Amino acid sequence: MIVKFEVYFDSEYWCAKGIDDDIFTQGKTLDELMENIREAVELHFP
């Protein structure tokens, strides 16, 4: 499964918003954001 995200920096956090799915997460670093994206996708699609 491929889930696409729009990723942006909002002056304090890296944010990711699902393009076709209602998923949103954030992280202080890109590495933390990637971990949070994986977790959010696993929770959204059990």
Q: What residues fall within each predicted segment?
A:
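A short N-terminal helical cap/helix-turn-helix that marks the beginning
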Residues: M1, E35-P46
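Conserved acidic segment of CheY-like receiver
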Residues: V3-V7
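Short aromatic-glycine-(Arg/Gly/Cys) micro-motifs in beta-strand/loop hairpins
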Residues: Y8-K17
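Short linear interaction segments
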Residues: D10, D31-E32, L43
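A short, exposed loop/beta-hairpin motif centered on an aromatic-Gly-Thr core
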Residues: D21-D31
